[in-house]
Amino acid sequence: MKLLILSLALVLALSQVKGNQPDWADEAANGAHQDAWKSLKADVENVYYMVKATYKNDPVWGNDFTCVGVMANDVNEDEKSIQAEFLFMNNADTNMQFATEKVTAVKMYGYNRENAFRYETEDGQVFTDVIAYSDDNCDVIYVPGTDGNEEGYELWTTDYDNIPANCLNKFNEYAVGRETRDVFTSACLE
């Protein structure tokens, strides 16, 4: 009887551990489209725009952030890191603002390959987001809702007017039931 109770307790504990991570966090099934280092290096060659998000407030970009974009420089192959230059606006300042962050590819959810980004801001804040899906010109990023962040999803692409269908479909699949808003639009360039 004790063995049965211990077995049930172990099964329950393991299911709760799995329950703390999203369904897409499965390296065997989805790892080919969750390569954080490949995604970071792509930021050096292209500007990426956050075209959609399911949350409004960020500890760095502010409340009701809009017009978020990023480009990278200073690639460090040994650390698997870049210096990222973010541009954004928010409800406190309608002028374009900038933030420089060191972004490092790290592992989350027991993955063997780096599948997440650790951001280190100039003032010492540290945040970690996870790649839910990535392809050549787009990323769907999961913000776990820790470290002062709201939980949600972001859709990033190199062409804000032509969002690749595969990424838009993944974003919509993962963001189902959440309010989605546009972040970077052509209005950001006016």
Swiss-Prot record:
Residues annotated as signal peptide? 1-19
Q: Disulfide bonds, which pairs? A: C67-C188, C138-C167
What Pfam family does this protein match (any one)? His_binding
What sections of the sequence does the record tag as coiled-coil? none
Q: Which GO terms describe its molecular function?
A: amine binding
UniProt keyword terms in alphabetical order: Disulfide bond, Secreted, Signal
The membrane-spanning stretches of this chain are none
The record's Gene Ontology cellular component field reads: extracellular region
Compartment list: Secreted
Binding-site list for histamine 1? S39, Y55, D58, W61, E101, F127, D139, E154
SUPFAM superfamilies with a match to the protein in the record:
Lipocalins
Superkingdom is: Eukaryota
Asked whether the keyword Nucleotidyltransferase is assigned, the reply is no
Q: In which tissues is it expressed?
A: Expressed in salivary glands.
Report residues binding histamine 2. S39, D43, F117, Y119, D139, W156
Alphabetically, which GO biological process terms does the record hold? symbiont-mediated perturbation of host defenses
Q: What does this protein do?
A: Salivary tick protein that acts by scavenging histamine at the wound site, outcompeting histamine receptors for histamine, thereby overcoming host inflammatory responses. Binds histamine with a high-affinity (Kd=1.7 nM). Contains two binding histamine sites (H and L), that appear to bind histamine with differing affinities (high and low).
Q: Which family does it belong to?
A: Belongs to the calycin superfamily. Histamine-binding salivary protein family.
Q: How does it assemble?
A: Monomer.
Name the UniProt record assigns to this protein? Female-specific histamine-binding protein 2
**Source species, please?**
Rhipicephalus appendiculatus
Taxonomic path: Eukaryota, Metazoa, Ecdysozoa, Arthropoda, Chelicerata
